[in-house]
Amino acid sequence: MVSSEDFYLRTNNVSHMKVVITGGCGFIGSNLAHELVDENEVVVIDDLSTGRLENNGDLLDNENYRFVKGSITDLDLLKQIFDGARYVFHQAAIPSVPRSIKDPAKTNEVNISGTLNVLIAAADNNVTKVVYASSSSVYGDTPVLPKEESMVPNPLSPYAVSKLTGEYYCKVVTEIYGLKTTSLRYFNVYGPRQDPSSEYAAVIPKFITKALDRESPIIYGDGEQTRDFTFVKDVVSANILAAKSSETGIFNIGGGKRVSINELAETIIKASGTGTDPGLTHVEPRDGDVKHSLADISRAESIIGYKPSYTLDDGLKETIGWFIE
């Protein structure tokens, strides 16, 4: 993993590099804040609609950390916050396929208009680079595996449409205004600080919570659908590598291996250490879910130097340990 020390630009009479993390109290944003705060001035903006203040509770007294409660839909606020920033890590979003289907208008407002605001504010403040959190959902249910960045997108939900639109805005802003941008297509990120309590929580924290409570995990569909799961520390590393790189464009960020949801659930039950097997509960599949997903990460490996450091077993062990604590 790339360390914050590698990322820190050491220059005379400058104590820290300023970086801004939108959605920095969320799952991925808070992990990124913890990685960068020792050697950088980290400013987090989050409206706490899905992020949690306690994710960065241990940073509140850190002189390198500053929290601003606000929304990326507030362009004037973003322009103020981005003043003097070297990099912007844009993680803020409504991060859920089911929620986007339930409320497409709000998803559009935050994920599309909010992203455009981030890009405008960054360009106006001469930010060196914006790293944008996109999603593997832009590929849709294309049967070809693994997913390559050159594939024609086929979004199946308002969330996926919003993430793809954000990529297009990044590309256009780079070409017209000269702001360097990189879009990272995340594949099923998991790890510490991921909220299991939300109605729209991701599968791994839900499964872990069920396993620790000795309850049967709920699986949508037959469970034979497959996913490429990526540990959050590898995603943090990818963000830092993308920021440091002079390259722009789109990169898949995944683990490079896939596992069925049934197998995932069974692995989590065993790794939970409860000594019980509550079995699996299957229910009707959800709208907007894809059948199979697997990242081709060769472009990220060759261009920005990304290489996943955590196997699924390693990542689950650390994640379950965090939930137990």
Language-model features, listed with the residues they occupy:
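N-terminal Rossmann-like NAD(P)+-binding domain of SDR-like oxidoreductases, especially those catalyzing
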Residues: 3-189, 233
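Generic structural signal for alpha-helix termini and adjacent loop/cap motifs
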Residues: 31, 51, 103, 121, ...
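Residue-level signal for the nucleotide or nucleotide-sugar donor/cofactor binding architecture
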Residues: 51, 73, 102, 110-113, ...
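Residues in well-ordered alpha-helical elements
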Residues: 76-79, 86, 98, 105, ...
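A conserved pocket-lining segment of Rossmann-fold NAD(P)-dependent short-chain dehydrogenase/reductase
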Residues: 100, 150-154, 181, 185-195, ...
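Aromatic/hydrophobic pocket-lining residues that form π-stacking "cages" and hydrophobic walls in ligand
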Residues: 118, 170, 207, 238-239
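Hydrophobic alpha-helix immediately C-terminal to the catalytic Tyr-X-X-X-Lys motif of short-chain
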Residues: 165, 169, 173, 203, ...
